[in-house]
A protein has these predicted regions:
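Acidic two-metal-ion nuclease catalytic site recognized across multiple nuclease folds
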Residues: 1-34, 185, 204-233
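A cross-family kinase active-site recognition segment
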Residues: 2-5, 148, 152-153
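Conserved non-catalytic scaffold segment of RNase H-like nuclease domains
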Residues: 11, 16-140, 144, 150-152, ...
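Short alpha-helix plus adjacent loop in nuclease-associated cores
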Residues: 156-173
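Generic recognition of well-ordered alpha-helical segments
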Residues: 161-164, 182, 206
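Short, glycine/charged-rich beta-strand-loop motifs at protein surfaces that mediate ligand recognition
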Residues: 165-170, 190-196
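Acidic, divalent-metal-coordinating active-site segment for phosphoryl/phosphodiester hydrolysis
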Residues: 195-206
């Protein structure tokens, strides 16, 4: 049986397939070629806080992102936006881990107001996240609701990359791959705060440490294709 290709890879960008607006403008900017060296690559590290883990049933509450350009985290261009959930939807038990409250989100922006800013910052860039299916799923759900289509994205997942770096000869990893644990394995400090922007910055710093390790292993400059999931079949 032919193996399936991973979901978190490069998606084709045909602007005419998208409605006029932010999605078409994103698709109109070519994705970086797979042969782009990390030293010339632009990424956007993203983290989201949500009411739960299911993009089909749960809702965005906060998004934080920061560009990573030429191997540097651009903190001056970092952004964080709280998002107001739909009427009648409360934060619920999710407040115990992200500390966002219904009162605190009462004056937050609507998703339709935040999405254009995120999509504009993603133009020509690779989306970076730790356990990226969460971010990809919620961004897809939001753009489907707002624009009727999923955003075309090229995605690097630091959790998947950490699994590749830590797996033994049997493909097994001993220990946690959570963001804090992955950072600790690279000698990076633990952040006391837990919010979307802090976690986006933490993922960005983790990627740079992972790239440094990959360069040592490969004996050459790391390319975008070295960060993407391995395709088979």
């Amino acid at each position: 049986m032919r193996a399936r290709r991973p979901l978190l890879a490069r998606r084709p960008r045909r602007p005419d397939r998208y409605p006029p607006g932010p999605l078409r403008e994103l698709a109109a900017v070519p994705a970086p070629p797979a042969t782009t060296p990390v030293s010339r690559l632009e990424l956007l590290a993203l983290d989201v806080e949500t009411t739960g883990l299911d993009p089909r049933a749960d809702h965005l509450l906060s998004l934080g992102w920061v560009p990573v350009v030429g191997g540097r985290v651009r903190l001056a261009e970092a952004r964080e936006h709280r998002v107001r959930p739909p009427d009648g939807v409360g934060v619920g038990a999710s407040a115990t881990w992200h500390r966002l409250t219904d009162d605190g989100l009462s004056d937050a922006a609507a998703p339709a107001d935040v999405l254009p800013r995120l999509l504009a910052d993603l133009r020509g860039r690779v989306l970076l996240a730790h356990h990226a299916p969460i971010e990809v799923g919620f961004v897809a759900a939001a753009t489907l609701t707002a624009y009727g289509a999923r955003a075309p994205l090229t995605v690097v997942d630091t959790l998947a990359l950490e699994h590749r770096l830590r797996a033994d000869v049997n493909g097994e990893v001993h220990g946690s791959l959570r963001l804090d644990a992955a950072r600790r394995s690279h000698g990076l400090p633990r952040y006391a705060a837990h919010d979307a922007l802090t976690d986006a910055i933490a993922a960005a710093e983790l990627l740079l440490a992972q790239v440094a390790e990959l360069e040592q292993r490969l004996g050459r400059e790391v390319l975008l294709r070295d960060l993407l999931p391995t395709r088979s079949g």
